[in-house]
């Protein structure tokens, strides 16, 4: 069955830019339908669907050098094709940017994960990819119930982190922080969750905002080359994903995640901008209240809350771009089956 759909595998066929990936459909002995739509895009349809069937987008490779999720996704697809991995949910697997992955670069012209807002952008390789991904989402979510829509966008962090894995929950106009989504996070042993406080330009935000999908950006370890990822540290995530796809009850115990709210976004305003810490500072490094950690022009950058921590710091961003997120730990609860905080 594998040879009839892929010459090597979903991942490595997608990366072989010298050979076309022809759209085709096959069915496994278990009755699962696999539709290869285009390079890097595979739809998987279970043999039977019902009112509880999820419509899940599982994407990776938005940044070309974040390869751990690609290796995991490739294994899931291999096991679906062979029949080893049961399928109970309709899935759209996406490997977004093969050209960048082949070069082992984050992007070619501009950051793909900043192109999903509704603002005009300069034409580029990445803008064409973003436009194509928007079309794929529209087609995949067409004629589906909002409650059935999920989107897990899988990444790796550029830098080390106090939390090896963490999730970013987008802020959308729809209720997209369901109890079932957060239960999956705990089952996957994702160490922390960041609750965004404003709209953004990411792929997962786009799904949440435009399709009311239960959406997350998941940061899984640190950037490495294909074959050099520490996948054993993502075992619980691997198992939780397999249980999610098959709708099986997990056999391993969940683990509580540390919850953070985004307290503010630091946007670079001046040429004279810098942080006081080194480039290898870890995500979620915390500061004391009032501690100065950088400057923007004449203005010092300081912690406004005790224990306020920094995530995704980048001193090299252009003026007007996000230079960091600041986060604080928060207690959460559920209202109407949605995660909230005071």
UniProtKB/Swiss-Prot annotation:
Domain of life: Bacteria
Cofactors, names only: Zn(2+)
Keywords from the named record: Arginine metabolism, Hydrolase, Metal-binding, Zinc
One GO term (biological process): arginine catabolic process to glutamate
Keyword ATP-binding: no
Substrates-to-products reaction catalysed: N-succinyl-L-glutamate + H2O = L-glutamate + succinate
Protein name per UniProt: Succinylglutamate desuccinylase
Organism for this UniProt entry: Vibrio cholerae serotype O1 (strain ATCC 39315 / El Tor Inaba N16961)
Lineage: Bacteria, Pseudomonadati, Pseudomonadota, Gammaproteobacteria, Vibrionales
């Amino acid at each position: 069955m594998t040879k009839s759909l892929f010459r090597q595998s979903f991942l490595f066929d997608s990366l072989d830019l010298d050979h076309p990936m022809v759209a085709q459909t096959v069915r496994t002995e278990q009755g699962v339908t696999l539709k290869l739509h285009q390079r890097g895009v595979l739809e998987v349809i279970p043999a039977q669907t019902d009112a509880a069937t999820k419509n899940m987008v599982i994407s990776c490779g938005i940044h070309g050098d974040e390869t751990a999720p690609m290796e995991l996704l490739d294994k899931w697809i291999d096991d679906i094709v062979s029949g080893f991995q049961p399928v109970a949910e309709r899935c759209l697997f996406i490997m977004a940017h093969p050209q960048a992955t082949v070069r082992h670069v984050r992007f070619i012209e501009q950051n793909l994960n900043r192109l999903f807002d509704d603002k005009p952008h300069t034409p580029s390789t990445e803008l064409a990819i973003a436009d194509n991904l928007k079309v794929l989402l529209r087609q995949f979510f067409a004629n589906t119930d909002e409650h059935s829509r999920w989107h897990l966008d899988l990444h790796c962090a550029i830098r080390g982190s106090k939390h090896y894995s963490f999730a970013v929950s987008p802020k959308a106009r729809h209720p997209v922080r369901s109890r079932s989504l957060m239960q999956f996070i705990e089952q996957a042993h994702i160490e922390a969750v960041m609750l965004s406080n404003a709209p953004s330009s990411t792929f997962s935000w786009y799904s949440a905002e435009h399709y009311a999908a239960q959406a997350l950006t998941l940061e899984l370890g640190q950037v490495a080359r294909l074959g050099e990822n520490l996948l054993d540290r993502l075992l619980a995530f691997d198992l939780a994903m397999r249980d999610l796809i098959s709708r099986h009850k997990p056999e391993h115990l969940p683990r509580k995640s540390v919850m953070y709210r985004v307290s503010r976004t630091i946007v670079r305003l001046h040429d004279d901008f810098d942080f006081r810490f080194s480039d290898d500072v870890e995500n979620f490094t915390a500061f004391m209240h009032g501690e100065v950690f950088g400057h923007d022009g004449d203005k010092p950058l300081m912690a406004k809350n005790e224990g306020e921590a920094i995530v995704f710091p980048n001193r090299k961003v252009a003026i007007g771009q996000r230079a960091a997120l600041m986060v604080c730990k928060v207690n959460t609860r559920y209202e109407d089956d949605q995660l909230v905080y005071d």
